[in-house]
Structures are given as C-alpha cells and as structure tokens.
Amino acid sequence: GKQHEYVLNARNHEHPIMKGLPNKWKHAQDELYDRMRGPGNIKDCLYTAYSDKGTGGSGREEPLIFTVDYGNARIFHTMLGHAGETVENCPAMQCAGFQITLLRGAEWAATGKVTQKVPADFPTEKQVSNRSNYKR
C-alpha cells in the first residue's frame, strides 16, 4: 500500500526487547506490509499496526516487529525501515523508533539480553521522532 505514518501497538511487554518501550508509538512515513509469512513461526509478537484499507491495507492488525521460532536460533524480524525516494528523504529509516527497535532486536538476537536504554527522543503515540542526520 501507500506509504504513510502509523501507530504501532505493543503486544508483549515482558520480552527483553520491549522493556521500557511505550505501549503505542507513531512510526514515520513507511510501507505497512500485510499477510507476510515465512518458513518460521512467529514466537513473540512484539508490535502490530492497523493496516488501513484506505491506504491499500488488509483492514486488520498486522504483526510488524516480532521474533521467529526457528530451531534453536534467536531471530528478530522487523517490517519497518523501507527506503525513501532519495538519501535525504528517508523518513522510515530516520525514525528513532525504527533505529532503536532494530538495535535492541540485534542485541537480543546476539546475546539474549538487551542493555540499551530507551532514549528521550523515542516517538510517542502522537509524535513521530526522526533523526534527520541519518543517511542510508
């Protein structure tokens, strides 16, 4: 569907990646993929977002940040962070929420723990927080 801003909804506050993260936060303009499935099963659904039919979506909550059960591996998956039209116009990757959840997910996948603090510029339910100095 069409790229747009949308709110992510927390689904599992107990997972180490989620500790200290808000219940809801607004993601920058990005694609919201739906009906995505792979060979692994979702183990821990961390965040979902409503996929609005008005933007070409499914009309339901879709899992966007989750862990995958695949053997003994720790796998973190995010559907966020699609490229913009130019290096300068890349709001999805500039979003502090995308950057922080990706870093926390990578740390958890590597170590099973998350030591990173949630920064003050993490987005809120009403406000996107972009780090404009990010370059892809």
Predicted regions and their residues:
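Catalytic beta-strand/loop cores that center a nucleophilic Ser/Cys/Thr
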Residues: 1-74
